[in-house]
Amino acid sequence: MPIIYLSPSTQENNLYVTGGSEEEWMNRLADAMIPYLDASGIQYVRNTPDMTASSSIRASNAGNYDLHLALHSNASAPANYGRTRGIIVFYYPGSTRGRRAAEIVADNLKAIYPLPNRVRTEATTSIGEVRQPRAPSVFLELVPQ
């Protein structure tokens, strides 16, 4: 049975123009995912809001996970609030399993996002939650705040 490390954002100071924070909304998203993970037989361990990105990575690396899934939302400059759209699904270059997971996530998001041509995968080495987990990792930058 697959097991993932679910890592919603811990950025409580990254505030949304519409209210709340990235930490709050990404934790709500993780909460909403739980019944679907359970129904699909996917086990998970999850970070907590009092953790940091670094402690989330350490916790992920302390386990034996099939995937590290980080949930984030893309920041937008105040002048662009409500105008910038799209989703980026990051993975580590050279990670075949990470890339495959990113492609699966992106394909499923394209099916539900109103602008499927704005959903893409991208390799990166600059994001800690992509570069440092031992498990294949996917880092979602969802619709801008």
Regions found by a protein language model. Name each.
Residues 36-38, 81, 132:
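A generic structural signal for short, solvent-exposed coil/turn residues
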Residues 13-25, 75-107:
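A short, glycine/acidic-enriched catalytic loop
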Residues 41, 86, 117, 134-136:
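A generic structural signal for alpha->beta connector loops
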Residues 46-48, 119-122:
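A structural preference for short, hydrophobic beta-strand core positions in alpha/beta folds
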Residues 85, 116, 123-126:
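Glycine-rich, flexible loop/turn motifs
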Residues 2-18, 58-63, 68-77, 121-145:
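Active-site-adjacent mobile loop/cap segments within catalytic or ligand-binding domains
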Residues 31-42, 62, 106-114:
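Sec-exported extracytoplasmic/periplasmic mature domains
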